[in-house]
């Protein structure tokens, strides 16, 4: 079994059991954002977390074991994404990436925002013109060092 197959199985079982990502996050004991990333193959679960979600989704032992192996992170295809929702994030970075970079450098200096020491919160924001998606990302600033 490959890690991609585990992800497919998780999605299938989630649908079959009519569970939400938030419900599965409760089983794992982490945020819905981190837990969803983990179940979609981008994070490593502890043994207890993998066994808990494995029980909830009736996953085979091989899948539970693979959930505990550090994944190849950022493993989406390198071509421009075709999924409309994912493409909007690509577009967002294409349009605002240089702005993010300029403002972060002006505020913090030369460095990067960590995606390792990182938090994200996704919520629905009611709006009379149509509900909005609110995503708050918080990453530790890591300055480049001189040597």
Curated annotation (Swiss-Prot):
Keywords: Lyase. Its EC number is 4.2.1.104. Coiled coil: none annotated. GO terms for biological process: cyanate metabolic process. It catalyses: cyanate + hydrogencarbonate + 3 H(+) = NH4(+) + 2 CO2. The active site is at residues 88, 91, 114. It holds the Pfam family Cyanate_lyase. GO terms for molecular function: cyanate hydratase activity; DNA binding. The keyword Transit peptide does not apply. It comes from the Bacteria. Catalyzes the reaction of cyanate with bicarbonate to produce ammonia and carbon dioxide. Belongs to the cyanase family. This is Cyanate hydratase. It comes from Ralstonia pickettii (strain 12J).
């Amino acid at each position: 079994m490959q890690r991609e197959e585990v992800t497919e199985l998780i999605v299938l079982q989630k649908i079959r059991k009519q569970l939400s990502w938030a419900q599965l996050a409760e089983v794992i004991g982490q945020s819905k954002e981190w837990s969803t990333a983990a179940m979609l193959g981008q994070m490593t679960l502890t043994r207890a977390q993998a066994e808990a979600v494995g029980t909830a989704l009736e996953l085979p032992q091989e899948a539970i074991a693979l959930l505990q192996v550090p994944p190849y992170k950022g493993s989406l295809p390198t071509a421009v994404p075709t999924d409309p929702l994912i493409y909007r994030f690509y577009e967002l970075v294409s349009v605002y990436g240089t702005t993010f970079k300029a403002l972060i450098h002006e505020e913090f200096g030369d460095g990067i925002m960590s995606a390792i020491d990182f938090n994200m919160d996704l919520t629905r924001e009611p709006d009379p013109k149509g509900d909005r998606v609110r995503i708050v990302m918080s990453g530790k600033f890591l300055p480049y060092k001189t040597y």
